[in-house]
Design a protein with these regions (language model features):
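A flexible loop/linker signature enriched in serine peptidases of the S9 family
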Residues: 1-11, 19-27, 36, 44-54, ...
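Active-site-proximal cap/loop segments of hydrolase catalytic domains
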Residues: 177-416
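Hydrophobic beta-strand anchors of alpha/beta hydrolase catalytic cores
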Residues: 159-163, 197
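Serine-hydrolase catalytic-loop signature spanning alpha/beta hydrolases and amidase-signature enzymes
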Residues: 168-170, 197
Length: 416
């Protein structure tokens, strides 16, 4: 493209209109079908600054002279097309609009809407999505998404729910389906109930994943409250799953900024998790810490490494925890060993910290059975509503549910 993508911060990817004739093993191995160097190809477009999406086309023989493209405040999904023509079926949507089907035969100059799959959305307080920028405590520029409820009144103060996992700003124009939770808070469910939902990006420093989360997330929470007067600084919660669940667990050993947190499938102790395996694949977990997502960057026996493993393990710092925490960890988790959640919960309980552990029998890293997803959704709602909205504490939080009553009695009714 003659450097157009670099200059305009656009990423271009080829969209192949031809049927995929690759064999299954070729698809698995990522075998790419060769392109005619003289053909015109369609492109998907993503702008890294605005997070907008779009389509383009270019002749491979003369890319700098034939490139044409557009972006918009939606996510486009290619569905089907006729090679050699401009006839394309595609989907588009954003936070407020689900992915309806459209047809164009003149490279998007005009389009015809083919479906209306979610007309019932009009009756709900859905909310809006906005790109938010701030600087981490160390000055690193960051991006995130702020989901605002509809109909916020001047002077009204709202609770804030923070969800995170690596980087999500590129999902600014994604449609989030309201559905029972497999592990994380459902964004439109919470915005429709009057929560501001903040989804921050995180930039990591090798050796200090916990402090990196603090550096980005907590700075973002403070910046959010400065930029949005309706955000109530005293009623902020945070929720994460897996890698996000670990960082949530670590954050409450570092700060008392949050009124309540939800931690799903957390690694509580990196020193004990290091020598384990991922039960689903049988792969040793050591590589994850040495050069993978956990970002310690060293084996546990290299000079100075043990201190990093301890620094980044929540169980060694639970004496500092004051924030109520709801943990979910399941006995068939093949990604993060179940004993990690047990270890974290047991240590919190030993020190009489406000902690609850949810465990769904025979469920894996993320819930599958719909009844369990619905159960988790209710418990997340009751937990956060109690601490952020002053709702009554349910029985399961007040006195717990005996093991022999599990699956028969929910404890959802009010204890007060």
């Amino acid at each position: 493209t003659g450097g157009v993508g670099r200059r305009t911060h656009n990423r271009f990817k080829i969209v192949d209109l031809k049927p995929d004739t690759r064999k299954p093993n070729e698809r698995r191995c990522g075998v790419v079908r060769p392109l005619d160097p003289k053909q015109t190809v369609y492109l998907s477009v993503f702008n890294e600054e605005s997070q907008e999406n779009g389509f383009g086309r270019v002749n491979l023989a003369r890319p700098s002279k034939t490139l044409e493209y557009f972006t918009d405040t939606v996510t486009y999904k290619y569905v089907a097309g006729a090679a050699g023509t401009d006839r394309i079926f595609y989907q588009k949507g954003n936070f407020r609009e689900c992915y309806d089907l459209y047809f164009t035969d003149n490279f998007f100059k005009t389009s015809t809407k083919v479906s209306a799959i979610n007309p019932q959305m009009a009756g709900y307080r859905w909310g809006s999505a906005e790109l938010f920028r701030w600087k981490a405590y160390d000055g690193t520029p960051l991006k995130g998404i702020v989901f605002m409820p509809d109909g916020v009144k001047e002077g009204e103060k709202l609770p804030v729910m923070i969800y995170f996992y690596e980087k999500n700003a590129n999902n600014l124009y994604t449609f989030w389906s309201p559905a029972p939770s497999r592990s994380i808070v459902n964004i439109p469910f919470y915005t429709s109930r009057g929560y501001i939902v903040f989804v921050p990006d995180i930039v990591y420093k090798v050796g200090h994943p916990g402090e990196s989360a603090y550096n980005c997330i907590c700075a973002g929470a403070e910046a959010l409250c400065e930029a949005y007067p309706s955000a109530d600084r005293s009623r902020m919660a945070i929720q994460g799953q897996s890698w996000g669940g670990y960082q949530t667990a670590w954050l409450i050993t570092r700060t008392n900024m949050f009124a309540a947190v939800g931690s799903g499938a957390p690694v509580g102790n990196m020193t004990s998790a290091y020598g384990g395996i991922r039960w689903g694949s049988g792969i040793t977990r050591a590589g994850q810490y040495e050069h993978g997502q956990s970002r310690i960057g060293k084996s546990m026996w290299e000079p100075g490494a043990l201190e990093l493993y301890i620094e980044n393990s929540p169980v060694f710092h639970v004496d500092k925890v004051q924030t109520p925490v709801l943990i979910m960890h399941n006995d068939a988790d093949g990604a993060v060993p179940w004993y990690q959640g047990i270890e974290f919960f047991s240590d919190l309980r030993r020190l009489d910290k406000p902690a609850w552990l949810l465990q769904y029998n025979k469920e894996a890293h993320n819930l599958v059975e719909r009844r369990n997803c619905k159960d988790l959704s209710v418990r997340l709602q009751q937990f956060f509503d109690h601490y952020l909205k002053g709702a009554p504490m349910p029985v399961w939080m007040k006195t717990g549910v005996p093991y022999e009553s599990k699956g028969e009695y929910s404890g959802f009714d009010n204890a007060e």
